[in-house]
Amino acid sequence: MGARKKEQAAVGRVGGEYRASRNGSSSRVRLEENRTSEDQAILERRAELLSKSGINSEYLSAASLLSKEPALEVGGECGAAFLPDDCQLDAFRTVAFIEKGNKCFASKGRYAEYFNNPAISLIRSEDGVVEGIQTVENVLYCKQALVVAAGAWTGSLMQSLSIKPDAVPCVPVKPRKGHLLVLENFNRIHLNHGLMEVGYLGHKAAKSPSDVDDDLLSISMTATMDMVGNLVLGSSRQFVGFNREVDESIIRCILDRAGEFFPAIRALSRNINQIRIGHRPYMPDGKPVIAPVPGLPKVLLAAGHEGSGLCMALGTAEMVGDMILNNPGKVNRTPFLMQGRFV
């Protein structure tokens, strides 16, 4: 998600430092909380499935949950799925770390950055094979492949790059706007783990914008402490195109929802230090596209990861690299192909 300049400036100060926390006193393991018997059944089943898959997971009773997170208001039917091996990434530091690694290849002619230089069209050979891309200022040739990984803009970019838009397969990735609230140096509560309500999982898989009102809003509680002690609250999801305006009513909804879980937040003023706005690349079936583009030799897509792009970035890059080099895949690629998924 995008951030205000104050947060962006912090990236420069940390340079390429990468941080992920887990376990011990600074752990940010995940708790998925339920408040109804229906949610309890969902999380108990989820914890069981994760355990069977080899992921450390257990279901916590209300008493066990309260012992781990005293700041929570825990009712009789409350409980949580506890994932003690989960990690929390600092998005800004992680991106800076990856970027620093990429720049090491610049001196070898294997990496370059082009900002404010939009792509205009694909460059094709006489037999239709894509050979490169034309930007406003440059012609960039590709030897083995061209990978389009433009997040929520991927679908519209693919259409704009083709001389005959109807010849390009439709990529139904949609922007799904979200707000995150950052409360700097917030000391009224202390969190020992990253927290989310079980409804967050359902909201993430909400219906396509073609099936619902464009401005349908879903709010589910998420709460984490970042590396410098700020409380980060979320989260909202809505289909409103690429609108980037801060919506004060959504801020109120996020705070009100968080207040249902944390009494200390209920009396909080609306003066939030930072508000992050961004667009998740939503796919109707909940899976990203990581695949060659039918009818466009040498072109691959990597898009539609919704809110999991950062966590899945390195795995996606490995999959794409294996496709380009014709290496055997380490995972089943079929669910991520384009064929048969979109009408």
Each model region followed by its residue ranges:
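Dinucleotide-binding Rossmann-like beta1-alpha1 core, especially the glycine-rich loop
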Residues: 1-68
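Glycine-rich, N-terminal phosphate-binding loop of Rossmann-like dinucleotide-binding domains
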Residues: 150-151, 303
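C-terminal lid/capping helical subdomain adjacent to the catalytic/cofactor pocket in oxidative enzymes
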Residues: 59, 64, 126, 286-343
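Helical element adjacent to the flavin cofactor pocket in flavoenzyme catalytic cores
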Residues: 80-145, 149
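Short loop/edge segments at beta-strand edges and connector loops
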Residues: 61, 115-118, 274
